Structures are given as structure tokens and as C-alpha cells.
């Protein structure tokens, strides 16, 4: 049950220190190792800005557990993602008394009341109400309290407060105790700058799940719970693409498959399909199970290697070009990564950017869309390592749809259902 997970996480948050009696001493190791030890020099920073990981051995009444806590894993990136998912798309602040609509979008109860206006008097005809994000009709009677989200908002706030404590970052002793969250920085401010500077593609070896605290999967599980439930829009699919009956997977149709009629919304050169759900506000995320390796960039007519599978996943604006050659870059209203030749590329302009350290590409890719901030970020769907992030100067300005491209008749791209 998720309440049991919540209890475990709250205990972890409160476990600031280990008392001297009945506990073993903490062991502090210099951050010069390979796996699980973060160093500034390993990310291109100066050797003098080395970080030290704190490893605490906690001996309980019935069992003994190791908690290896590496500061970057508990740093600003994780808390930022939690806060993004705990932010109301209408007011931009943390959810207050969140309510859930029939379309699965959540808002503050007061924010939604202001948007919809005062309910009509008894006996008068009610004006239609719709979701501010997706536009789907949502009657007032469909509102229900989102208790789970309210709990996750509180957890996000507690994590932020915990990391804001000076001792949690500097790793100084306080009253004979050693904080178990954070690292010993030399100097601490340099390491915080390093965190901000390196929110770019990172090596998987520096963000290994083996080095996370035992309760860290609880936080990751909550992030996965908020994944949007998507389907594909067959009306936008290239005529050579085959959409599954449940509209959750797409692959290149085998030869001889009857092609559907063309239409104004359908891609005619790029082997792509859009999601049926579009977003004009708020923060949304979805996961895609990818093919084995793979270039959709050759929609311009370049030859492709028949032995390779090719795919791209990401997001596209409503204005993306459907006919002719499509510009696969932010200037063409496309924010995507491409799997090709056993490597992963960010589709940037004028040339794609090879994402070093991402070999082979992850089997699951998580797309995080923050409409107001103009940010589209990509994560490993299992470890939540950041792969790449596109950043616009402001809000994206139009409805954004999930984008799926594939040139592979063998392995489909599949939307991972929410809660899986």
C-alpha cells in the first residue's frame, strides 16, 4: 500500500542523524572512487572541488542496514522534479486542497473555482465546464479530492526544507550528530555551482541506482504514479505506420498492408504520429518503451541503413509541419531525442548532439514537459537519470503533443501505461 511507502519515506526524512549510543560511527570516504562517488573532476570541474560521500552504518534493534547517500542523488534535480509535479498549472504554486478531474488533471480547488466561476442556482441550466489543460468536458460533479497528490505535495515540501538546512549541504557536525543527507563539500558553494552547471547529459555510472538510499525507490515510485495516460492519434500517423488496436504502440507496417487515406493532419514524409492528448498549460510526463536502436532525420530522403532500427521520441507543437520535409529541431516545433546506431542523439540545430555516456540507449525514455517554463526534458525511464533538456526562453506558446517516429517494422514504440 502507498501509505506504507509514505510512512517509510517520512521516517527516512526525519532520520537526520544517528545517536552516539547503540550506533556505529559514521565512515567518511573521500570522493575519488569510481562508482557512486561524485567528484567535480569527473564532471569536468577543478580537482580542488572534490566532494566526499557520507556512508552511515546504522545498527537497529533487529537488523543492520547500510545507507549510502550520495549528495547529487538527493540534490536539486530530484527536488525540482518533485516540485514540478506538485505545482498547480493555474496558479504556479504548490497545490492547496488539490482536486482531480475526470480527465486525470489536478488543480487547486480554489483555482478551479475561480476559472469556472460561481455554480449556477438550483433549477437553472449549468454552463459547460472543461479542463483548463486539455479542454475535455468535465462536469462539476466529477470533481473529487486528490488525497494522494496532497500527500506528495507535503513530501516535496519536506524534502525542500531538509535540503535547505545549512548542515545538510555543508556536512558539518551539529550537536555531536552527523547529518545523513548531503555531502562534505570542499568548498560547499563550489559543489552547488557544479550541480547547476552540469544539469546536462550525464554518464549513467555517476548516477547508479546501486548507490541510492534504500528508501529512494519510494520517491521514484511517486514520480511514476503521476505519469500521464496517453494514446496515439491515428489521424496524424504516416500512412506506412501501423497503430495497435489499443492505440498505445506504433511500428512500420509490413509490405502489403493497406494504407489509410491521406488527410490534412497526417504526416506524408516523416514516419511519425502524434499523441491524441495535447497540452497547453501545466506539467506533464509520459514514458515510451523504445525499439532496439535507431534515424528519423532522413525524412529529407537520405539513405538509411536497413540493418538498423530508427526511432525518435519527444514532443511537437500543434504547428509542426505535416507535409514535406519536417525540421526536427526546436525551430521546427519539435523537441526530441533519436536512437540510432546504438546511440542516443538530441535533435538540435544545426546538427544533432550526441549524448555521451548513453550507450546503449535506455529501453524506457521519460519525457517531462513543463509548458510554462518552456522546458522539455528527457530521463532514463528506470533510473530517472537526466539525458538531455531543451530550454526555451519562455512558455512554449501553443498546444504540445507527444511525438513518436519509427522506421522499424520489427520492434514497435510503445507508450508505457500510467501506474506500470
From Swiss-Prot:
Domain called B30.2/SPRY: residue spans: 210-420
This protein's UniProt keywords: Cytoplasm, Metal-binding, Transferase, Zinc, Zinc-finger
SUPFAM superfamilies recorded: Concanavalin A-like lectins/glucanases, RING/U-box
CC per GO annotation: cytoplasm
ZnF (RING-type) intervals: 88-135
Outcome when changing residue 108 to S: Complete loss of E3 ligase activity
Pathway this chain belongs to: Protein modification; protein ubiquitination
EC assignment: 2.3.2.27
GO molecular function terms noted in the UniProt entry: ubiquitin protein ligase activity; zinc ion binding
Enzymatic reactions: S-ubiquitinyl-[E2 ubiquitin-conjugating enzyme]-L-cysteine + [acceptor protein]-L-lysine = [E2 ubiquitin-conjugating enzyme]-L-cysteine + N(6)-ubiquitinyl-[acceptor protein]-L-lysine
Tissue distribution: Expressed in testis.
Function noted in UniProt: Plays an inhibitory role in anti-RNA viral innate immunity by targeting the adapter DDX3X and promoting its 'Lys-48'-linked polyubiquitination. Alternatively, enhances the cGAS-STING pathway activation by promoting 'Lys-63'-linked ubiquitination of STING1, facilitating the STING1-TBK1 complex formation and STING1 activation.
Name recorded for this polypeptide: RING finger protein 39
Amino acid at each position: 500500500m502507498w501509505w506504507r511507502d509514505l510512512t517509510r519515506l517520512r521516517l527516512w526524512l526525519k532520520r537526520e542523524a544517528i545517536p552516539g549510543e547503540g550506533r556505529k560511527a559514521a565512515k567518511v570516504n573521500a570522493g575519488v572512487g569510481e562508482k557512486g562517488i561524485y567528484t567535480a573532476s569527473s564532471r569536468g570541474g577543478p580537482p580542488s572541488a572534490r566532494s566526499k560521500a557520507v556512508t552511515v552504518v546504522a545498527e537497529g534493534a533487529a537488523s543492520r542496514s547500510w545507507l549510502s547517500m550520495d549528495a547529487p542523488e538527493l540534490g536539486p534535480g530530484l527536488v525540482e522534479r518533485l516540485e514540478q509535479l506538485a505545482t498547480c498549472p493555474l496558479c504556479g504554486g504548490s497545490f492547496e486542497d488539490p482536486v482531480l478531474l475526470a480527465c486525470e488533471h489536478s488543480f487547486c480547488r480554489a483555482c478551479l473555482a475561480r476559472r469556472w466561476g460561481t455554480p449556477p442556482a438550483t433549477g437553472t441550466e449549468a454552463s459547460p465546464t472543461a479542463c483548463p489543460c486539455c479542454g475535455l468536458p468535465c462536469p462539476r460533479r466529477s470533481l473529487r479530492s486528490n488525497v494522494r497528490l496532497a500527500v506528495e505535495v507535503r513530501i516535496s515540501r519536506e524534502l525542500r526544507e531538509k535540503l535547505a538546512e545549512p548542515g545538510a549541504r555543508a556536512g558539518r557536525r551539529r550537536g555531536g550528530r552527523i547529518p545523513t543527507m548531503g555531502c562534505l563539500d570542499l568548498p560547499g558553494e563550489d559543489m552547488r555551482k557544479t550541480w547547476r552547471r552540469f544539469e546536462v547529459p550525464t554518464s549513467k555510472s555517476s548516477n547508479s541506482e546501486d548507490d541510492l538510499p534504500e528508501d529512494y525507490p519510494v520517491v521514484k515510485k511517486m514520480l511514476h504514479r503521476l505519469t500521464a495516460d496517453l494514446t496515439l492519434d491515428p489521424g496524424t500517423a504516416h500512412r506506412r505506420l501501423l497503430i495497435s488496436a489499443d492505440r498505445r504502440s506504433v511500428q512500420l507496417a509490413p509490405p502489403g498492408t493497406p494504407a489509410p487515406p491521406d488527410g490534412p493532419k497526417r504526416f506524408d514524409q516523416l514516419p511519425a504520429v502524434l499523441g491524441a492528448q495535447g497540452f497547453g498549460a501545466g506539467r506533464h510526463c509520459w514514458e515510451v518503451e523504445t525499439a532496439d536502436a535507431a534515424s528519423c532525420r532522413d525524412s529529407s530522403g537520405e539513405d538509411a541503413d536497413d540493418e538498423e532500427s530508427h526511432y525518435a521520441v519527444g514532443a511537437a507543437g500543434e504547428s509542426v509541419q505535416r507535409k514535406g520535409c519536417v525540421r526536427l529541431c526546436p525551430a521546427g516545433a519539435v523537441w526530441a531525442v533519436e536512437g540510432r546506431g546504438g546511440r542516443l542523439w538530441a535533435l538540435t540545430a544545426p546538427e544533432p548532439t550526441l549524448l555521451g555516456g548513453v550507450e546503449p540507449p535506455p529501453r524506457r525514455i521519460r519525457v517531462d514537459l513543463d509548458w510554462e517554463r518552456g522546458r522539455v526534458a528527457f530521463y532514463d525511464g528506470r533510473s530517472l537519470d537526466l539525458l538531455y533538456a531543451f530550454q526555451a526562453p519562455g512558455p512554449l506558446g501553443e498546444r504540445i503533443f507527444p511525438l513518436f517516429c519509427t522506421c522499424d517494422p520489427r520492434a514497435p514504440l510503445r507508450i508505457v501505461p500510467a501506474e506500470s
